[in-house]
Amino acid sequence: MLKIGSHVSMSGKKMLLAASEEAVSYGATTFMIYTGAPQNTRRKPIEELNIEAGRKHMEQNGIEEIIVHAPYIINVGNTTKPETFQLGVDFLRMEIERTSALGVAKQIVLHPGAHVGAGADAGIQQIIKGLNEVLTPDQTVNIALETMAGKGTECGRSFEEIAKIIDGVTYNEKLSVCFDTCHTHDAGYDIVNDFDGVLNEFDKIVGIDRLQVLHINDSKNVRGAGKDRHENIGFGHIGYKALHHIVHHPQLMHVPKILETPYVGEDKKDKKPPYKLEIEMLKNGTFDEGLLEKIKAQ
């Protein structure tokens, strides 16, 4: 079975149930959530996440595994502000606890961190320090380090940087990788013409068994732009053919694929989610040039 879905919202009273219902409405077989707002530290208690009802709905609809995304305010790469680093460590610990409580997520996707001017080596050492403070040998969820585009002072823009972080961490069996197609393309890897070559390179440097999550996004920018701006499937510089190849790649069949493509529409208050139609299009093997209009008409 193709494990494909998108980022969905966990909110209101229904929480996990709402997320599962949204995913099922898109024809998804997996999904990704934040356990609270990604831009702040306010979190509902675990008891209010409506886990049991959510899991029951997932089971009824054949969804076995979901992904959690850590909030992007976490920066364990910060060497200049001890309070930012400490917030990242404490918050990541809490996210591991919350994700474990869900019982259906094995991976927490984490942007490795930004060195904020101290240089990549210093940032990487700080990320290692943070992960060593957080990870325990008996935890049941992995931290999936996301491949980054190289915007600003981001660490993790190359497979070598990801490998360096993993190598420095004591309990690194608790680390995996989230391969983001837009980020990897924007970082300079040629996933359009030579994805198999890129995957082989990843295998040599990091190890393909570490690749446990895929973020499937097209890119608004040319390869190597270092920008990180997602585009709808087939409407960017990566293109439908390459993304379809990645989604159906025989070596990655078991890996959950998560769409983080933009909502569609000119009116900011009335943008439509693209995921149902993008998932259908990735399943059926044919690019639909009229897709954006169909999404708007939903």
UniProtKB/Swiss-Prot annotation:
Zn(2+) 2 binds at residues 146, 180, 215, 260. Coiled coil: none annotated. Keywords: DNA damage, DNA repair, Endonuclease, Hydrolase, Metal-binding, Nuclease, Zinc. One of its GO terms (molecular function) is deoxyribonuclease IV (phage-T4-induced) activity. SMART domains: AP2Ec. Binds 3 Zn(2+) ions. Zn(2+) 3 binds at residues 183, 228, 230. InterPro entries: AP_endonuc_2, AP_endonuc_F2_Zn_BS, Xyl_isomerase-like_sf, Xyl_isomerase-like_TIM-brl. One of its GO terms (biological process) is base-excision repair. Its EC number is 3.1.21.2. Endonuclease IV plays a role in DNA repair. It cleaves phosphodiester bonds at apurinic or apyrimidinic (AP) sites, generating a 3'-hydroxyl group and a 5'-terminal sugar phosphate. PANTHER family: APURINIC-APYRIMIDINIC ENDONUCLEASE, ENDONUCLEASE IV ENDODEOXYRIBONUCLEASE IV. This is Probable endonuclease 4. The gene is nfo.
